[in-house]
Every structure is written in structure tokens, then in C-alpha cells.
């Protein structure tokens, strides 16, 4: 009984102390500086550009058509990863690009740190078109219209290549008509914010896509080709080259694969026909100087 009385006494005292406390404002003391509450659109663009060459130069396609074969880790050579082969495209660069579009559309002023909002959206649309064009050329039907919605739709419908190409042309047209050449763009590790180069990128992609569909939709192909040809890349000096760096985290992934590792080897199918690949065209160059 005495213990019970003591217990209730301590409880009452504790509640009294709690009730007498004032709310203390700790300011930013409990905020994690390493976990920003808002995404930086400049950082999102850098991330999307950083992941792009890793995707488009992915080694899996070379194994699936048996140009090369795995030596140590053999999952891809045995086709055991094909069911998730494009997951990283959606959860990585494409999600970053969609976030740039959404943030600048909903709250343009708050995200002006990434540059002129129109340019952020335009570049995100150009890269989004590039991503999806590459994906549908690789895998055929993939989710597009219902993709990138996160938990709001975890089972997006697959779209046809025709629908994706049509949407891609629209993205490029919207980007070209809205970009501001006198505006700014931050986080751009490809062209350093030069919007004239982004316009050439968009027109060159548009030209490429038009040529891709020439046999499927000749009329649309001609229209888009005509629209893009004068604004596309016109010389080798204008080639678009991703600026790989020297450190391991940002160097060319193919260098890592072959410089010090032995993960891949030339497949028998390729090596057995090597004489055909190497020498079938030599007759056209016999006696011709290679020049300086």
C-alpha cells in the first residue's frame, strides 16, 4: 500500500513538473544540415546528367547480343536480370528530371537557384525525350504516360513505341519554343548553361528520331526532319561529348571494366567471325593513303 502511494505521488509530481514547463524554441538545433528539406534543382540536373552516360553505355546489350560474355559474374550473360534492366532509369535520372519539371511548374520562384525556370524545364524535357527514345528503342513498349508518379501509381501501363515517339517530339517542340537563350541554367555539366547548345541537342535528337520512324510513319518523319535539320549539329566540332573526369568516381565506366578488371571476354560467336568483321571491307582501302 505504501509503495502504491509513493508511486502515485511521484507520478503526480512528474505531471506537475511537465505541466509547468514552457515550450522551448531550439531554432535550427534539431535540423540535419546534411538532409535538405527541399531538393536543389541544380543538383537534380547534375544527377540526371551524371547517370545518363552510364545508362546509354551499359554493357548488358553487348552481352545479350553476344558480342562479349561475362567471366566472373554471369547473371547478365544468362539473361537473369532482364526483368529489372530499366528500373534504374526510372528511379534515377528520369525521376530527377520529372522533379525539376514539377518543382519549377508548381513553385518557380522558390527554385530559381537552378537558373531560369523556363530553361530548367526545357532542358529536363529534352533529356526526358532522350531517355525515353533510347529506352523504347532498346525495350520496345515501356511505361511513359503513367510513369514517374511514385506511390500514386505503382503499376503504370505500358505505352507503344508510336505513342512514346509522338510524346517525345512534343517534349522537344515544347522545349525549343520555351527556352530563354539569355537566361541561366545551373548544374549543367554538359554544356555549362549554354542554351544554344541545348537547342542543337534538341534538334539533333529530333532529327535522329525522325530518321528512326521513316519506315513506320514517313509523313511525320519528313515533317520533323524538315523542322530540325537547320538547327541540328552540322559539323564534327559540334559533337556532343560527355565530360568524363580523371577520378575513379567520374571516369569512363568502360575504362574501369577493362583497365584493371577481367569481368568480360570476347564471346566465341564474335571471335569465330572476327575475320569477317575485320577484313571484309579491307579491299576498299588497299593502296589508299590514310592521310595525315
Q: PLM ranges: what are they?
A:
Residues 21-84, 88-91, 99, 105-109:
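Membrane-proximal, proline-rich intrinsically disordered regions
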Amino acid at each position: 500500500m505504501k509503495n502504491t502511494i509513493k508511486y502515485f505521488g511521484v507520478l503526480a509530481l512528474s505531471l506537475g513538473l511537465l505541466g509547468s514547463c514552457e515550450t522551448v524554441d531550439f531554432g535550427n538545433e534539431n535540423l540535419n544540415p546534411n538532409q535538405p528539406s527541399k531538393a536543389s534543382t541544380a543538383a537534380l540536373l547534375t544527377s540526371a546528367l551524371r547517370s545518363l552516360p552510364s545508362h546509354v553505355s551499359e554493357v548488358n546489350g553487348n552481352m545479350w547480343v553476344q558480342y562479349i560474355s561475362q567471366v566472373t559474374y554471369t547473371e547478365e550473360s544468362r539473361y537473369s536480370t532482364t526483368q529489372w534492366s530499366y528500373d534504374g532509369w526510372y528511379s534515377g535520372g528520369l525521376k530527377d528530371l520529372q522533379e525539376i519539371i514539377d518543382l519549377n511548374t508548381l513553385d518557380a520562384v522558390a527554385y530559381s537557384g537552378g537558373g531560369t525556370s523556363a530553361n530548367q524545364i526545357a532542358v529536363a524535357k529534352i533529356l526526358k525525350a532522350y531517355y525515353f527514345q533510347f529506352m523504347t528503342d532498346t525495350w520496345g513498349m515501356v511505361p511513359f504516360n503513367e510513369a514517374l508518379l511514385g506511390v500514386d501509381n505503382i503499376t503504370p501501363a505500358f505505352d507503344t513505341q508510336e505513342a512514346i515517339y509522338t510524346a517525345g517530339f512534343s517534349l522537344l517542340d515544347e522545349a525549343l519554343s520555351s527556352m530563354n537563350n539569355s537566361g541561366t541554367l545551373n548544374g549543367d555539366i554538359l554544356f555549362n548553361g549554354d542554351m544554344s547548345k541545348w537547342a542543337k541537342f534538341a534538334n539533333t535528337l529530333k532529327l535522329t528520331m525522325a530518321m528512326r520512324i521513316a519506315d513506320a510513319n514517313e509523313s511525320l518523319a519528313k515533317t520533323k526532319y524538315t523542322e530540325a535539320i537547320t538547327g541540328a549539329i552540322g559539323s564534327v566540332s559540334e559533337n556532343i561529348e560527355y565530360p568524363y573526369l580523371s577520378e575513379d568516381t567520374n571516369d569512363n565506366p568502360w575504362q574501369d571494366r577493362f583497365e584493371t578488371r577481367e569481368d568480360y571476354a570476347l564471346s566465341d560467336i564474335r571471335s569465330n567471325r572476327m575475320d569477317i568483321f575485320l577484313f571484309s571491307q579491307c579491299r576498299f582501302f588497299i593502296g589508299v593513303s590514310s592521310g595525315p
